[in-house]
Amino acid sequence: MAKVEVQQQGDLLEKLIAVNRVSKVVKGGRIFSFTALTVVGDGNGRVGFGYGKAREVPAAIQKAMEKARRNLVDVDLNGNTLQHPIKGRHSGSKVYMQPASEGTGIIAGGAMRAVLEVAGVQNVLSKCYGSTNPINVVRATINALTEMTSPDQVAAKRGLSVTQILG
């Protein structure tokens, strides 16, 4: 289950998706440590995720936030929704997202919702298939968002005008 915490730092929105206790078994017993999964975005088309591991929870969260800030990618949004329906996949997780009309809101669950919120998407319909492991869902969602192309990019590739592309 993805537990989401929001924090604003500077111009970036930060969300904590999950914290897990993990253990390493050694000769003398178990050594416990914590992992944290976070997403960071500016609410305007930039999003990144980070995964941190440390002996203490705050240190794991701090590491994850720093990694997320270093891994920001740009997403080409159409106002406050997506350009077109998209699919993303990572490992056993598959995600499907499609643009929605104004006032729909973010219809997404758990980890996918956190990514879409910090990316600045406000109206979207989405569904996660297969594995709902938060790490894989976050990676699949970001993969899908980065694969999205705007009509301008499609027109440039095809050598046509945007009006010809849109019909």
Swiss-Prot record:
Keywords linked to the UniProt accession: Ribonucleoprotein, Ribosomal protein, RNA-binding, rRNA-binding
Statement: the UniProt record of this protein carries the keyword Chaperone = no
- State the InterPro entries in the record: Ribosomal_Su5_D2-typ_SF (IPR020568), Ribosomal_uS5 (IPR000851), Ribosomal_uS5_bac-type (IPR005712), Ribosomal_uS5_C (IPR005324), Ribosomal_uS5_N (IPR013810), Ribosomal_uS5_N_CS (IPR018192), Ribsml_uS5_D2-typ_fold_subgr (IPR014721)
GO CC, any one term: small ribosomal subunit
Q: Which GO terms describe its biological process?
A: translation
One Pfam family per UniProt: Ribosomal_S5
Q: Which GO terms describe its molecular function?
A: rRNA binding; structural constituent of ribosome
**All residue ranges annotated as the S5 DRBM domain in the record:** 12-75
Task: Tell me where on the tree of life, at the top rank, the source sits.
Answer: Bacteria
Q: What is known of its domains?
A: The N-terminal domain interacts with the head of the 30S subunit; the C-terminal domain interacts with the body and contacts protein S4. The interaction surface between S4 and S5 is involved in control of translational fidelity.
Family, as annotated: Belongs to the universal ribosomal protein uS5 family.
Q: What HAMAP family does the entry give?
A: Ribosomal_uS5_B
Q: Tell me how this protein assembles.
A: Part of the 30S ribosomal subunit. Contacts proteins S4 and S8.
Q: What's the stated role of this polypeptide? A: With S4 and S12 plays an important role in translational accuracy.
The protein here is known as Small ribosomal subunit protein uS5
Q: Which species does the entry assign this protein to? A: Pseudoalteromonas atlantica (strain T6c / ATCC BAA-1087)
